């Protein structure tokens, strides 16, 4: 296993030196890579970000895709064909981006909510057909889409690991794999460690996020037990730390999470 940390879209920073400072802090703390939240690949300054990553010898482990659900209403479950097509083309542009970076894209929030499509069966069918199209495109581009089960308060479809596994296996595309997020597992799963059984062949990415979205250790997620379970199933990919609800400065969060990971016995594979 390797460790990464989730940073916001570089365009949201007040200047590049602040972004570079976050990367330097991550490097000093001991993280191996970065994951970025990106709103629009067409506005992503790839050359500048690449220079920033080269300074700390980092790879880009993943791009998150879901922010435009809130900002633009992009989703795949809706009966509105125009919105679906816009979202599909956005995801294809993420596939292009990931292909250039030899990275993955994280997909979950752009499924949409039941308020976008109250008929769960119809919405799920639209999501499936859209991801089949994007997944086939990703095969051509040698890129991977990691399908994330998101809790029912944020997404209306495929909320549990079992539902996501069924979705991924049903598509049967080498470009569509599974990822899991500890925050969503805590909400949706009866036994938070047991759902990892029999998914090792499709598990491609992991998000580490505390139960209250604060720094690791501030909630009640069993981090040590989770790492032991990942080791049991042979997971060797990235674990990306995400902190989304805190009063701490970012550098303090980066350091605090690494301290908790070390305390819990994280070992690189």
Annotate each PLM feature.
Residues 9-11, 38-40, 66-67, 111-113, ...:
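Active-site-proximal loop/turn and secondary-structure-junction residues that shape catalytic pockets
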Residues 69-73, 105-111, 206-207:
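Short, basic/glycine-rich phosphate-binding loops at helix/coil junctions
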Residues 1-95, 99, 173, 201, ...:
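N-terminal pre-domain/capping segments
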Residues 48-57, 127-137, 195, 225-229:
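Catalytic-core regions built around general acid/base machinery
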Residues 1-9, 13-30, 158-180, 184-269:
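Histidine-acidic metal/acid-base catalytic patches
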Residues 35, 62, 106-107, 146, ...:
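Conserved beta-strand positions in the central sheet of alpha/beta enzyme cores
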Residues 17, 77-177:
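Active-site acidic/histidine proton-transfer and metal-coordination neighborhood
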